[in-house]
């Protein structure tokens, strides 16, 4: 198992893309194998996520930048399988963000929290057929949604109606205020 993972990692380091091109240049200049360079970068990021200033920002960038980039590429591609994969990631990311918001007061006390969060997000975006986001969606989020879909639809409709009513009220108030301002300006001329 470990040998197979190492082989997949090494194969990924030799695929043609921007990161592997940079690794190839560093490997050529230093003579250090690109897998060792990648391990060093991963170790540095892991240590930084534990003790570094701005670990929260780094973790959120890791969980956002690559998935956002790949999501845009998926939208622009003719295939729809990749769209579903990345929509699933964003649903899980959103649910995780809401849960994290409410649990943050407890989670911030754990010294390895940002490292664990980053590992979780990388697991969710892993380029495998059954990565973390797909597993969490199919086992937890989807069953919950299907069980409560009618209730959720009613709540969403109620919120939409209230938001539309509030927007109409604000629009009417803005029209009245504009009319009053124009009336006051005409009185001065």
UniProtKB/Swiss-Prot annotation:
Effect of knocking it out?
A: 60% of embryos die 7 days post-fertilization. Embryos have cardiac developmental defects including a lack of cardiac looping and atrio-ventricular conduction defects with dysynchronous beating rhythms. Increase in RTN4 protein expression levels. Morpholino knockdown causes apparent sarcoplasmic reticulum membrane vacuolization in ventricular tissue along with structural discontinuity between sarcomeres.
The UniProt entry, under Pfam families, shows: TB2_DP1_HVA22
Organism domain of life: Eukaryota
Q: Which GO terms describe its cellular component?
A: sarcoplasmic reticulum membrane
Question: What intrachain disulfides are recorded?
Answer: none
Q: Does the keyword Transmembrane apply?
A: yes
Region Required for dimerization and maintaining endoplasmic reticulum morphology: list its residue ranges.
114-185
- Enumerate the Gene Ontology biological process terms: endoplasmic reticulum membrane organization
Membrane topology per record: Multi-pass membrane protein
Residues passing through the membrane, by range: 35-51, 58-75, 95-115, 118-138
| Record-linked InterPro entries | TB2_DP1_HVA22 (IPR004345)
Which stretches of this protein does UniProt put in the Cytoplasmic compartment? 1-34, 76-94, 139-189
Any ranges marked Lumenal in the topology annotation, and which?
52-57, 116-117
Keywords (alphabetical) are: Endoplasmic reticulum, Membrane, Sarcoplasmic reticulum, Transmembrane, Transmembrane helix
Location(s), subcellular:
Endoplasmic reticulum membrane; Sarcoplasmic reticulum membrane
**Function in brief:** Plays an essential role in heart function and development by regulating the organization and function of the sarcoplasmic reticulum in cardiomyocytes.
Give the family this protein belongs to, as stated in its UniProt record: Belongs to the DP1 family.
Please quote what the entry notes about the protein's domains.
The short lumenal loops between transmembrane domains 1 and 2 and between transmembrane domains 3 and 4 may impart a wedge-like configuration, thus deforming membranes.
- Know the name of this protein? Receptor expression-enhancing protein 5
Tell me the organism.
Danio rerio (Zebrafish)
The UniProt gene name for this protein comes to reep5
